[in-house]
Curated annotation (Swiss-Prot):
Keywords: Calcium, Hydrolase, Metal-binding, Protease, Repeat, Thiol protease. This is Calpain. Residues 563-582 are annotated as: Linker. PANTHER family: CALPAIN (PTHR10183), CALPAIN-A-RELATED (PTHR10183:SF433). It comes from Schistosoma mansoni. GO terms for molecular function: calcium ion binding; calcium-dependent cysteine-type endopeptidase activity. InterPro entries: C2_III, Calpain_cysteine_protease, Calpain_domain_III, Calpain_III, Calpain_III_sf, EF-hand-dom_pair, EF_hand_dom, Papain-like_cys_pep_sf.
Length: 758
């Protein structure tokens, strides 16, 4: 079914179309000049799609799939306000000659959070009050600048240290040209973080927590007492997460994603779960567009061990290199402790160990070997997998880097991203265990066209991440168990896989279902097309989500959907009705009843008479159905009343009668327990059985409009009301004039008349 175009004209009777709102154009049918006054463009739904260009990919996952033109206008207004927030605030503060105090993150114990040791022992001071020579940067950012404070956020420190060495990553998070003194200084600092699918700017004031009576920063700080960018960055991240306390004991993977926009994969190193080809994977990751970190599980926070390593502590994995050692290849891992001090590995290949004497000077030069107490050290692959618990790998994609930027000499990975919401009774079908509802879950098709260039097995590495909105730290809610299934896509697939198709297919890959912010899994598959189905574990759980797919080679993506079409009652339903009429002979009887009650002047009946007729027929023989009421009968009249007379003639009635019997037949099929209701999850299948195929956006509107909010079910009355209104809508659109593109053209008056008479 084509689109609808409403065109306003001076006399409200002339229809026309233009691609440019606000211009005078000539109506191709009348030759008259008309003026178009639309506020929302034809392609407004394109804002739901990611923008892929030379810059970082732009995407707003908070826009609902059900976006309307009114919603679009509100969204544009909000975006304009948000984009000017920083400039507007700075301008106001300069006019008022005041320093900003952030009302959303006040300088008090609320910002500190649940850290009892610091309650009422903190003062808040601005950088110039802590050090009169305070600067945002002192000689530029470096991974050796940063020191951890009293907060257990070494995981954040490790990632900040890692990205500080790469301007293409660091400058996105820490905007340049920020000063802590001078005519432009107003006490406002800004940072950017990637959050649930897009980059957000976080504004903070520059008041920082210091120990009472001393000018020493409590939390993250620079080893240069005049430099404050790292302390302010930590504060902005604390604001994003609710308070400083929420930064204690996090994971590197979360910080990696929030500071790069990449997607993280966790690799367990214990012997049972360790991949058999781990060293090959690490070699490839070291050569790809990736950041890597690692950690050691320990029951004691930051436990210092005899071998120089620290338990429950995050490290950066900065390199994987082979060296020739005693005639064989020895793989070495280069790591860095974010504390940047002498707490380093003390075993084989540590700084100054005898093993290095047997390595050629050229090889030492090739790997930039140096021995200083800077927290950076080397160890063998064998010791690494024995001592460490996991590796976290962050793959950088279209949201992480601009088109002309690279990382380790490698281009960013290709990326596809989808956003959605699991909605109760619509598409929150749960996992495959829920056989009657699983098929309603969102479906996305991806196509990977070429195998990986850095191996020879003719397969593609595909990394899939499913993320749910992070409300845990904001409102204390728990994450829901989420996961996804991957299926081979039929060659001709352009619409949703049906319930029957899904229940007879086996997934080629699947993730675990875990109650974490994000679930990721990596697969190696031949080039081709695949269907990814994300879901919660249980049905009827409402959560916003984004689904991301990364690959070294190009990806094409499509949200699977149906076109809005009316194909009429299927042949099997028509045949069933013929058989039924042979047995009951009701068609002739109902025709005689119509003739008996018609108005002799018009040979037609109104909605009241229609109700009397239908309530004395077999159509009303449905459990718990209270009969054809006035509202339902009015809509039934409207569905066949082509000239808006408010009456139904005999031929119109008989057409409606046949269709109504077909709709009743379909309702009974889905009302398996003969209760007079069926589940809202079955509505789409019932519509398909009636010949109506509707899009994801339309089924959402239908279910929200016609389900019983108390039972989450569809009654016979609401089902019939939906059927007749869909009939009216489809036939109105099909009958209306169209342009060369198949878009239906409505004047404002026509649209309003059909909207109210339905």
């Amino acid at each position: 079914m084509g689109r609808i175009q409403i065109v306003y004209s001076p006399d409200e009777n002339v229809s026309g179309r233009t691609n440019r709102p606000g211009k005078e154009v000539v109506d191709p049918r009348t030759g008259r000049i008309i003026k178009v006054k639309r506020e929302t463009p034809d392609d407004y739904l394109n804002v739901l799609k990611p923008i892929k260009g030379p810059k970082r990919m732009e995407f707003n996952p908070y826009l609902p799939k059900t976006l309307t033109p009114k919603g679009y206008a509100k969204f544009k207004l909000m975006m304009n306000v948000a984009s000017k927030q920083y400039e507007t605030l700075v301008k106001r503060l300069k006019t008022e000659r005041t320093l900003w105090e952030d009302p959303d993150f006040p300088a008090n114990d609320k910002a500190i959070g649940n850290l009892p040791d610091f309650r009422e022992r903190i003062e808040w001071k601005r950088p110039h009050e802590i050090n009169p020579n305070a600067k945002f940067f002192a000689g530029g950012a470096s991974r050796f600048d940063i020191e951890q404070g009293a907060l257990g956020d070494c995981w954040l420190l490790a990632v900040v240290a890692s990205i500080s060495g790469y301007p293409q990553l660091f400058d996105q998070v820490v905007p340049k040209d920020q000063e802590l003194k001078g005519p432009e200084y107003v006490g406002v600092v800004r940072f950017r973080f990637w959050r649930f699918g897009h980059w957000v700017e976080v504004l903070i004031d520059d008041r920082l927590p210091v120990r009472q009576g001393r000018n020493t920063l409590v939390f993250m700080h620079s080893n240069d007492p005049t430099e404050f960018w790292s302390a302010l960055l930590e504060k902005a991240y604390a604001k994003l997460n609710g308070c400083y306390a929420h930064l204690s004991g996090g994971s590197q993977s979360e910080a990696m994603e929030d500071l790069t926009g990449g997607i993280c994969l966790s690799l367990e190193l214990n012997q049972k779960e360790r991949p058999s080809d781990l060293i090959d994977q690490l070699k490839i990751y070291a050569q790809r567009c990736c950041l890597m970190g690692c950690s050691i599980d320990s029951s004691v926070m930051e436990q210092k061990m005899d071998n120089g390593l620290i338990g429950s502590h995050a490290y950066s994995l900065t390199g994987v290199y082979p060296v020739n050692y005693r005639g064989r290849t020895q793989w070495l891992m280069r790591l860095r402790n974010p504390w940047g001090d002498s707490h380093e590995w003390k075993g084989a290949w540590c700084d100054g160990s005898p093993q290095w004497r047997e390595i050629s000077e050229q090889e030492k030069k090739n790997i930039n070997l140096s021995f200083t107490a800077d927290g950076e050290f080397w160890m063998s692959y064998e010791d690494f997998v024995t001592c460490f618990s996991r590796v976290e790998v962050c793959h950088l994609g279209l949201e992480s880097l601009e088109y002309n930027q690279n990382f380790h000499g490698k281009r960013r990975l290709d990326e596809a991203i989808f956003s959605g919401q699991w909605q109760r009774n619509v598409n929150a079908g749960g996992c495959i265990n829920n056989r009657t509802t699983y098929w309603t879950s969102p479906q996305f098709r991806i196509t990977v066209e070429d195998p990986d260039p850095d191996d020879d097995d003719n397969k593609c590495s595909v990394l899939i991440g499913l993320m749910q909105t992070d409300i845990r730290k904001k409102v204390g809610a728990d994450f829901q168990p989420i996961g996804f299934m991957v299926y081979n896509a039929p060659d001709d697939l352009n619409t949703l896989l049906s319930r029957a198709q899904l229940l007879t297919r086996s997934p080629i890959a699947k993730s675990q279902f875990i109650n974490t912010r994000e679930v990721t899994a990596q697969f190696r598959v031949p080039p081709g097309s695949y269907v990814v189905i994300p879901s919660t574990f249980d049905p009827n759980i409402e959560v916003n989500f984004i689904l991301r797919v990364f690959s070294q080679t190009s990806i094409t993506e499509q949200e699977l959907d149906e076109d809005n079409t009316n194909q009429g009652l299927p042949d099997d339903v028509i045949e069933a009705l013929k058989l039924e009429d042979t047995l009951l002979d009701e068609d002739q009887e109902i025709e005689q009843k119509f003739l008996a009650i018609r108005d002799p002047k018009t040979n037609a009946i109104n909605a009241v008479k229609l109700g009397e007729l239908l309530n004395n027929s077999t159509l009303q023989d449905i459990p718990n159905f209270q009969g054809f009421n006035k509202e339902l009968c009015r809509s039934m009249v409207a569905s066949v009343d082509n000239n808006l007379t408010g009456h139904v003639e005999l031929n119109e009635f008989m057409d409606l009668w046949i269709q109504a019997k077909g709709w009743k037949h379909i309702f009974i099929k889905h009302d398996v327990d003969q209760s007079g209701y069926f589940s809202a999850y079955e509505f789409r299948e019932a519509l398909n059985d009636a010949g109506y195929h509707v899009s994801n956006r339309l089924i959402n509107a239908i279910i929200n409009r016609y389900q019983d909010p108390g039972t989450d079910k569809i009654s016979f009355e609401d089902f019939m009301l939906c059927m007749v209104r869909l009939k009216t809508a489809f036939e109105t659109i099909e009958a209306h004039p169209k342009n060369i593109e198949g878009t239906s053209l409505f004047s404002a008056e026509d649209y309003l008349r059909f909207s109210v008479y339905i």
